[in-house]
Design a protein with these regions (language model features):
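Small-residue-rich segments of transmembrane alpha-helices in multi-pass membrane proteins
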Residues: 57-69, 91-92, 116-128, 149-155, ...
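Juxtamembrane and boundary regions of transmembrane helices in multi-pass small-molecule transporters
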Residues: 98-109, 152-170, 195, 200, ...
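Structural signature of hydrophobic alpha-helical transmembrane segments
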Residues: 19-34, 54-58, 81-92, 113-118, ...
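Alpha-helical membrane segments and immediately flanking helix-loop junctions
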Residues: 106-147, 286-321
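Structural signature of multi-pass alpha-helical membrane transport proteins
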Residues: 1-53, 64-73, 182-251, 271-278
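Membrane-embedded alpha-helical segments of transport systems
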Residues: 92, 121-125, 142-161, 300, ...
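Alpha-helical transmembrane segments and their cytosolic membrane-interface
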Residues: 1-7, 138-185
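Interfacial helix-loop-helix linkers and transmembrane-helix boundary segments
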Residues: 44-58, 70-87, 103-111, 201-204, ...
Length: 345
């Protein structure tokens, strides 16, 4: 099993190196993702997997890298753009819930399952809620979340390069060097942040804990140094491999009638994101690519890493993505529970 995983990892790095030469953002993440998808599709082996713990280590490294981009101006930017952050969150959530209603009606599927499956950025929590709510179909939620996330992660890099004319700046996994404390000294602080975030039940703690801990250190200490190229490349590949392994052919077969609606819904969410990105870009003056990555219905790590590789404003991207995830994780579950309970009364 270990040798199989090592071979997959080497293949992911090789494919990622090829994507670097093609000047694509997040090349090693895409390399890991495509390697896993090819493996699952061509071999049809159910015993091939990527350990969750390896992916969590990778998220800590990515969290450090993302958090290291924060400066003392980040908080001021957030306050200045608070209205835009709220509007962006409401628009993407409203579009997601509306698409869930349409999908449930056309596919004749459970509405609660479709809503949980269509919410952007909340796969971890929605899968936990599935275990607590017997009315929710976990197969539907898993397939919808995985296909949406994979669709966004695969298409967004191509869209920002060929539609929005973004440029990859230098190495696609290299981080800007702000000087400051050496990364080896600060990484233990990131691990501590991950531990605390897990203990207080923060959403996606292995990512958000290191981000917040590193960001706080970076702001108050005047900056931290980036992790080495090879370490960030390995982290991206590990995250991509885990994502690709989540696609289960058996689950798709059981919910195959929904696949077209999921793909169309994902495309509509991307179009809505581009539209809202134009509004945010015109209002606040940051680039259209930054605004699009901030709006895109993908994961925090994936969109932030994509912005990092193109020299975009990662703090803006992270702020918008983080607020959306917090809203989804804190407010949406009780609101859904209240709404469905009132509907049944």
């Amino acid at each position: 099993m270990f040798l199989n995983r090592l071979l997959l990892f080497i293949m992911a790095l090789c494919l990622g190196s090829l994507l670097v030469r093609m000047h694509l953002p997040i090349p090693f993440l895409l390399g890991g993702l495509l390697t896993a998808l090819l493996c699952k599709t061509l071999t049809h082996r159910s015993d091939v997997s990527w350990p969750k713990q390896w992916r969590e280590y990778a998220l800590m490294i990515a969290g450090y890298g993302i958090g290291s981009t924060f400066t003392s101006d980040t908080w001021n930017n957030f306050l200045a753009e608070l209205v835009g952050v709220a509007e962006a969150t409401i628009v993407i959530l409203a579009a997601s819930i509306a698409l869930a209603f349409v999908t449930a009606k056309l596919a004749r599927e459970n509405l609660k399952s479709c809503i949980m499956g269509m919410l952007p950025g909340g796969m971890t929590l929605t899968m936990l809620l599935c275990e607590e709510d017997k009315e929710v179909n976990p197969n539907v939620v898993m397939v919808m979340q995985v296909l949406r996330l994979l669709g966004v992660v695969i298409t967004v890099p191509f869209l920002v390069i060929w539609l929005l004319h973004a440029q990859v700046t230098g190495s696609s996994v290299a981080l800007p060097n702000h000087g400051g404390m050496h990364w080896i000294v600060v990484v233990p602080l990131s691990i501590l942040g991950s531990f605390i975030a897990t203990k207080i039940h923060m959403p996606t703690p292995k990512l958000l804990g290191p981000i917040l801990a590193t960001a706080a250190f970076s702001v108050f200490d005047g900056g931290v140094q980036p992790v080495p190229f090879w370490l960030m490349a390995a982290a991206q590949a590990s995250i991509g491999l885990f994502m690709g392994m989540q696609l289960d052919a058996d689950r798709i077969v059981k919910t195959e009638k929904m696949v077209p609606y999921i793909l169309i819904g994902t495309a509509i969410l991307i179009v809505v994101s581009i539209g809202m990105a134009n509004v945010l870009s015109a209002r606040y003056g940051f680039s259209l690519v930054t605004a699009f990555l901030a709006m895109a219905p993908g994961g925090i790590a994936e969109m932030s890493l994509a912005g990092m590789s193109m020299g975009e404003n990662v703090s803006i991207i992270l702020t918008y993505q983080l607020v959306r995830v917090l809203v989804i994780n804190i407010f949406i579950p009780p609101l859904l529970a209240w709404w469905f309970k009132a509907k049944q009364a």
